[in-house]
Amino acid sequence: MVPVHAHDYVTDPPSTTGRTLDGLTLPRVFADAVHRGGDAVALVDGEYALTWSAWRTAVDALARGLQESGVVSGDVVALHLPNSWEYLTLHLAAASVGAVTMPVHQGNAPSDVRALLERVRPAAVVLTARTQEGGGPLTGPALREVLPELRAVLVTGDAAGEGTETVTEMLERWSGEDPLPVEVRPDSPFLLLPSSGTTSARPKICLHSHEGLLTNSRAATEDTADAYAGTLITACPLTHCFGLQSAYSALFRAGRQVLLSGWDVGRFLELARRERPSVVVAVPASCTTWSPGCARTRTAPASARPD
């Protein structure tokens, strides 16, 4: 089960917002988006694109794969990944089996990632392939030695190291299979979100429920909801709540999500010219480099130009 300790998590948020929660769960929001989107393109990651129907199939396969690995409702699935189709698909898969996602920032040092994992003791960890090089603290054998509860170590890329499996291997093995039924309630644990750690050596970890985080995401963007029915570029990390909120907002409107794996002005402008986004989600520091880039090229689409 999710390890909840008073010094780590806020478990009783104030009830003085004046707005009731919407009773949402991520599996239901995703199912509604799939129904609306059908065979339209839902997710773009570089040259890799998924329609809503294909994304549903991939989510189901990885959900079943997690279950067959031993992940059960309430377990934690840690994602230490850049923006990618693997990240969002595994987040959806984990939610559909009642598991709790913990995003871990790419900028964290391996020792800091390891410290977070040892605190939370996840049932599954998903990492980039480069973390398995050189016998570091995030290799499959090293993690399994200190995390006896660990049932799966997944890596991106084409080659699995010792004690790991690639995301693609799990996807292919369980393709066409549905996950075993699990009750996911609006008040079920959904996300463990660590703070940046800039105020102490021990990051705080906040526990969010499905309805709490999703209601907030819908409320935050409801004034501009129609724009999210178009094409959205997420140019900030999905390991931050701001990045995740952009993904949820697109799901509410069955919008097309385009991912930028890391900030680079040239790659962003190229992507914006190609995709013609109606919404770009980025942090202010990125936008300070975006404006000069647009001025130099004079070729960014109007929809992607800052005012």
From Swiss-Prot:
Assigned protein family: Belongs to the ATP-dependent AMP-binding enzyme family.
GO molecular function per UniProt: CoA-ligase activity
Keywords associated with the record: Antibiotic biosynthesis, Ligase
Record GO biological process: antibiotic biosynthetic process
Pathways per UniProt: Antibiotic biosynthesis; candicidin biosynthesis
PANTHER family, per database record: LONG-CHAIN-FATTY-ACID--COA LIGASE, MALONATE--COA LIGASE ACSF3, MITOCHONDRIAL
Coiled-coil region: none
Keyword presence, Ligase: yes
Described function: May be a p-aminobenzoic acid-CoA ligase that activates PabA to start the biosynthesis of candicidin.
Name of the protein: Protein Y
